């Protein structure tokens, strides 16, 4: 049996941006559901954070969520299992009140949809899989006990595990220890949007780009085979963020007249100016770029020739925002718990980068 695994869909991201809803819809209409149809996949498991806002949902977002996700699952007769993530709950100390419970209980197709705010071992065609929702202070002991008691060798969850990258180049320095998952052959998790693997634990990553931190970081969904235990990655070809290097040295103006800018429509574009020797050519380039109707264009003069460095080198040489904040906290003189302050700052930062101003 093959299961489609998807996680961190964050319906309503960037302050319920219509542009991002359109971007999400394109992925579902042209990539996700066509793949399920072609391969006859009738079971989908969502590993948490199906919505973005913790305390409410915008009516426009809800309408699009139902039309492009729920009803598409329903008309295909797909069995849908969703694990509650931290963005699906309004409170930090309980999962009992959650978006899935409130939304799915009012939908006629709810008999084909199962949501899990408590741990549960589910059998998928002979393969036991432990489904683990977000772990908080109140359910920590019960969650650990459920992991120890489950006969499953495979675990799907929404975990915050120490040592994994939250986004590319930004490592999480707190959370669950990896050794508590040692009894499982395989653990697949949502929560961190960067796709990564260490040992028996794999973060699946989000299906699409939502911030500049996601730039050039592969996004998509996965297919898990319950018989072979193999995982296949299906990449999303559509991107929201682009970097364009401008260098008109040795180029004729005619080249800029022939350039195709259509791929930048409804996306964010960062133009890195390496060499600008012909002002007319540069203006022509920008005019044609703006005619493609991007959401936003930012222009950066490249004094350090960043285009000649791999992205990995740029990330390693530059301190990310969270590292700067963490160092600031460590140098402060105060009586409080610095670890808790770091967590608070990280949460505030994550909220900020997901807002559409």
Where are these regions (language model features)?
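Extreme N-terminal starter segment of soluble prokaryotic enzymes
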Residues: 1-4
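Core catalytic region of metal-dependent phosphoesterases/phosphodiesterases
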Residues: 9, 13-120, 180-184
């Amino acid at each position: 049996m093959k299961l489609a695994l998807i996680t961190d869909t964050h319906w309503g991201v960037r302050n319920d941006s219509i542009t991002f809803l359109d971007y999400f819809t394109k992925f579902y209409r042209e990539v996700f559901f066509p793949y399920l149809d072609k391969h006859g996949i009738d079971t989908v498991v969502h590993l948490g954070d199906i919505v973005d806002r913790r305390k409410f949902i915008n009516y426009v977002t809800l309408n699009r969520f139902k039309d492009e996700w729920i009803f598409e699952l329903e008309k295909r007769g797909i069995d849908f299992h969703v694990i509650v993530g931290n963005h699906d709950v309004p409170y930090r100390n309980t999962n009992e009140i959650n978006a899935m419970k409130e939304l799915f209980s009012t939908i006629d197709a709810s008999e084909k949809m199962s949501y899990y705010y408590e741990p549960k071992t589910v059998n998928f065609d002979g393969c036991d899989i432990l489904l683990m929702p977000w772990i908080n202070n109140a359910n920590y002991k019960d969650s650990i006990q459920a992991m120890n008691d489950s006969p499953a060798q495979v675990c799907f969850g929404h975990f915050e595990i120490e040592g994994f990258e939250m986004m590319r180049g930004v490592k999480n320095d707190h959370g669950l220890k990896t050794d508590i998952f040692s009894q499982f052959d395989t653990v697949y998790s949502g929560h961190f949007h960067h796709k990564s693997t260490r040992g028996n634990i794999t973060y699946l990553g989000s299906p699409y780009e939502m911030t500049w931190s996601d730039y050039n970081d592969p996004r998509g969904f996965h297919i898990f085979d319950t018989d072979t235990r193999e995982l296949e990655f299906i990449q999303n070809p559509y991107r929201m963020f682009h970097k364009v290097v401008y260098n008109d040295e040795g180029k004729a103006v005619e080249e800029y007249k022939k350039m195709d800018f259509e791929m930048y429509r409804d996306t964010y574009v960062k133009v890195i100016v390496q060499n600008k020797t012909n002002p007319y050519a540069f203006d022509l380039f920008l005019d044609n770029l703006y005619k493609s109707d991007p959401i936003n264009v930012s222009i950066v003069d490249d004094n350090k020739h960043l285009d000649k460095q791999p992205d990995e080198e740029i990330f390693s040489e530059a301190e990310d925002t969270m590292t700067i904040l963490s160092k600031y906290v460590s140098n402060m003189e105060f009586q409080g718990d610095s670890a808790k302050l770091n967590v608070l700052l990280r949460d505030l930062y994550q909220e900020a980068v997901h807002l559409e101003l």
